[in-house]
Regions:
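Alpha-helical hydrophobic membrane-insertion segments
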Residues: 5, 25-28
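Short, low-complexity N-terminal intrinsically disordered segments enriched in polar/charged residues
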Residues: 27-58
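Exposed beta-sheet edge and beta->alpha loop/turn motif
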Residues: 100-152
Length: 152
């Protein structure tokens, strides 16, 4: 009797496993898509924190917290001067909303890696409509940091 119950339990486990496999194959659970979404969320958090530095004219701090790739391409003084020339005249941020975000592993003129390109619809005191693009990347130490910023 005990052997019969064990055999039934093993069959039940097998049926449950087969059912799970069937459901997963029917609905196509995509592990990569889930990891891309997690990366997008982590990158979005970092981008928002970084934008607060820029919004508060903490340009040196924004450079300090940027990705190594960014810092090797732009010296701190140049970064500060560029933001003072182009970002400061826009005035205070009025509103900012995520327009799109996309995970990618390659970008033009950048090393292969993990990036999330985030576009924001923004409104400033002196520019009612702008698109800000912030590109965090997974840095060598495993932390997300901003590697690019562009205002259009």
């Amino acid at each position: 009797m005990v052997k019969h119950l064990i055999a039934m339990a093993d069959n039940s486990k097998l049926l449950v496993l087969l059912f799970v496999i069937l459901i997963v194959s029917l609905f196509g659970y995509d592990v990569k898509a889930e990891s891309d979404k997690a990366a997008e969320q982590a990158a979005l958090r970092v981008a928002n924190e970084w934008l607060q530095l820029v919004d508060n004219t903490k340009y040196d701090e924004s450079w300090n917290s940027a990705a190594e790739f960014f810092k090797s391409a732009v010296v701190r003084d140049s970064w500060r001067q560029t933001l003072q020339a182009f970002r400061s005249p826009l005035g205070k941020i009025i509103s900012r909303k995520v327009k799109s975000k996309k995970f990618t592993t390659s970008l033009p003129e950048a090393p292969d890696g993990q990036y999330v390109v985030i576009q924001y619809e923004a409104s400033f005191e002196n520019k009612k409509s702008a698109i800000e693009t912030v590109t965090p990347m997974l840095d060598k130490d495993g932390k997300w940091r901003v590697s690019g910023y562009y205002i259009k």
